[in-house]
Amino acid sequence: MSALKKRKITEKQPETNSDSEAESVSSRGSAKDETQTSGEEPAPAKSFKELGIIDQLCEACENMGYKAPTPIQSQAIPLALEGRDVIGLAETGSGKTAAFALPMLQALMEAPQTLFGLVLAPTRELAYQISQAFETLGSTIGVRCAVIVGGMDMVAQSIALGKKPHIIVATPGRLLDHLENTKGFSLRNLKYLAIDEADRLLDMDFGESLDKIIRILPRTRHTYLFSATMSTKVESLQRASLSNPVRVSVSSKYQTVSTLQSSYICIPHKHKNLYLVYLLNEFAGQSAIIFTTTVHETQRVAFMLRALGFGAIPLHGQLSQSARLGALGKFRSRSRDILVATDVAARGLDIPSVDVVFNFDLPMDSKTYIHRVGRTARAGKSGVAISFVTQYDVEVWLRIEHALSKKLPEYQVEKDEVMVMSERVAEASRQATIEMKSFDEKKGARGKKFGKGKRSRDDMDQEEG
């Protein structure tokens, strides 16, 4: 082990053994999982070394700015290092990626092998971010990752797989395409599987692809499943994919973190634009995500804010993959400080320092509300979330408060101060309407070109919102 710490990974190629056949989906689910919650556990560990992480990876954690393990890391990592299958239930921004990446990398160092680990994620952006985390944490040991997602060239991906990476990070649809069609590609010797954002994977109808992948993977493996919630579908996936797992939890079903200041603002629907601009000026200089419910509204709000001089960029599922990654890159680097987004940005994206979340359009359910406001107040930092409640949203807002089991305070503003900007905002809205006409025409042309209907397997990891 000590020798491995001082050199890069020199791996053996996995042997191709036709006797290593895939299990059936139901064969691993006979044992019940144990349960332990954060309330039963001691305080989080003070260091990764205390959890059993080796010095080389501890140093990588320091380089990434991980000062101390988060609660989910403190609970999950020791169990994973013991060789247990783990189910991790934790809120967005709790450090789930490192909770499965560190044990996987440590095991890779102890027994170097190509095609060692597989991580399944629901969206293309999340897959790239997980891969980046693996490569950064494993940089001193020469870890190689391949990202296999829809919308990219199959041949180039086949070449990347042919180079035998240590870790594959993939969305289920495209991975299954390669397992079924790419000559010479096999995961029969895979040692580790991590399923991230499991509830989101199943919400996006990846269930059939997951079922097929799990049947193909070897029976003898370590599996980690991480999810924000434990739904009936996730329970079924757990029974199908994990063997005698232990469950760790640091959040309840509908819970926001204590460092989050959540409030609402009650306004007439016709003045939503005005109040948004007023609040953005109130929080000037801070990074913000503005959530909307439709692609059209995302683009319109972004156009309007740009006309007013704000550094706003849109993010939604109808942008090209390169445009989406470009938008995220600009927002992370703070060259743009306002992201206008559909719920494509509510889960799993690596945006570590969002100061404010605005629910410009209310989500229709409490679960989505939790995921949206989870973009701020992450990893112990404070954050603000303000929801716009118009005369049409009262019933939805009351349902959200009921699910949270608390009444949230109203954010107070002076109406006269808000109305000062009315003429400028009205003009910016008119400009946005003109730009939207051009946007809708282009979108219509794309629809005629490519046709409509049920999404293909290749497009399932690109959210429609």
Swiss-Prot record:
Region of interest: Disordered: 1-46, 436-465
Subcellular location: Nucleus
Gene Ontology MF annotations: ATP binding; ATP hydrolysis activity; RNA binding; RNA helicase activity
Residue stretches in coiled coil: none
One GO term (biological process): rRNA processing
Keyword Zinc: no
Enzyme Commission (EC) number: 3.6.4.13
Domain of life: Eukaryota
Comp. bias intervals (Basic residues): 445-455
GO CC aspect terms: nucleus
Chain ranges for the short sequence motif DEAD box as given in the UniProt record: 196-199
UniProt-annotated binding residues for ATP: A90, E91, T92, G93, S94, G95, K96, T97
Alphabetically ordered keywords of this record: ATP-binding, Helicase, Hydrolase, Nucleotide-binding, Nucleus, Ribosome biogenesis, RNA-binding, rRNA processing
Compositionally biased spans, kind Polar residues: 15-29
SS bond partners: none
Motif (Q motif): 46-74
Occurrences of domain Helicase C-terminal (ranges): 275-419
Catalysed conversion reaction: ATP + H2O = ADP + phosphate + H(+)
Positions of the Helicase ATP-binding domain: 77-248
Oligomer status and interactors: Interacts with the SSU processome.
Protein's job: ATP-dependent rRNA helicase required for pre-ribosomal RNA processing. Involved in the maturation of the 35S-pre-rRNA and to its cleavage to mature 18S rRNA.
Domain-level remarks: The Q motif is unique to and characteristic of the DEAD box family of RNA helicases and controls ATP binding and hydrolysis.
Family that this chain belongs to: Belongs to the DEAD box helicase family. DDX47/RRP3 subfamily.
Protein name per UniProt: ATP-dependent rRNA helicase rrp3
Organism the protein comes from: Emericella nidulans (strain FGSC A4 / ATCC 38163 / CBS 112.46 / NRRL 194 / M139) (Aspergillus nidulans)
